Regions:
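Amphipathic alpha-helical packing elements
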Residues: 1-48
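C-terminal edge-of-domain segments
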Residues: 54-85
Length: 85
């Protein structure tokens, strides 16, 4: 992921899905683009999920480089601007 936003959340009452939706909403308001990829700390998900879930259109994966209570949300691909506009 080349484009993203680091999100901090320490509310233990929120589910990972709620946190991802909240971060995605903020990301859209800030950048005007829908995120499609999110990295979360290792051990966040139930082991039966094999380290990956889908939250709406967002692919959520565990990653060793993400600190506890954080997530990295953004685009799994580079957005190409239309030079003709």
């Amino acid at each position: 992921m080349k484009t993203g936003l680091l999100w901090f959340e320490n509310d233990k009452k929120k589910t990972i899905k709620n946190i991802v939706f909240e971060a995605a909403e903020y990301y859209f308001k800030k950048y005007g683009v829908c995120s499609d990829y999110c990295q979360i700390p290792l051990g966040t998900l139930d082991p039966r999920m094999n380290g990956e879930i889908q939250v709406g259109e967002i692919r959520v994966v565990e990653h060793k480089g993400i600190s506890k209570e954080h997530l990295w949300i953004g685009l799994d691909h580079e957005v190409k601007e239309n030079k003709n506009e």
